[in-house]
């Protein structure tokens, strides 16, 4: 069963409202301002259509920039990084390519740090991270944009008597400060 955290259930509405706090951002990042095909694809991601793809795949949208109109950019771009962002990015690429058939988008799955490093080094056009960017990454010239939020439900066995815990309790469990349910219940 999923626990309430600080009195809030793990729902899309509560994550959007900020009352359920256990969530992480799905970020994309570019070195400087995106241009051409990369910019057009990012515009798609942040459009009504792109944010619908995000919601249809179980993530929390970030609002949109309105309806999408492609600028007709062609060529090839590389999107690289987080294995957590990859499944929804695959769906975004598929939907975008249905609109812009002349776009070639290569998706490289790795991890957030590798994606951000590739974007800083110019070996990919768009990096993906399932976390906030580190200071060193923004200082390295990356501009990030949150495309979705990923809520993380805290789940316990159905026989566990707990129905709720505080965000401090969750932190204590994952940092090892507490190791038994008796310690959490205090």
Please name every model-derived segment.
Residues 1-186:
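Exported/periplasmic ABC-transporter solute-binding proteins
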């Amino acid at each position: 069963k999923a626990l309430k955290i600080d009195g809030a259930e793990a729902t899309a509405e509560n994550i959007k409202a900020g009352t359920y706090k256990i969530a992480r951002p799905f970020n994309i990042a570019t070195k400087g301002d995106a241009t051409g095909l990369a910019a057009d694809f990012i515009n798609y991601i942040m459009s009504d259509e792109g944010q619908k793809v995000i919601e249809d795949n179980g993530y929390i949208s970030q609002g949109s920039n309105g309806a999408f109109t492609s600028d007709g950019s062609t060529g090839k771009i590389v999107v690289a990084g987080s294995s957590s962002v990859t499944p929804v990015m695959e769906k975004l690429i598929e939907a975008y390519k249905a609109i812009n058939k002349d776009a070639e988008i290569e998706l490289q799955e790795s991890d957030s740090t590798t994606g951000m490093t590739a974007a800083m080094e110019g070996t990919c056009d768009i990096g993906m991270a399932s976390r906030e960017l580190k200071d060193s990454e923004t200082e390295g010239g990356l501009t990030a944009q949150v495309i979705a939020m990923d809520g993380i439900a805290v789940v316990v066995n159905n026989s566990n008597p707990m129905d709720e815990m505080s965000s401090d309790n969750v932190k204590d469990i994952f940092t090892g400060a507490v190791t038994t349910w008796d310690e959490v219940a205090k």
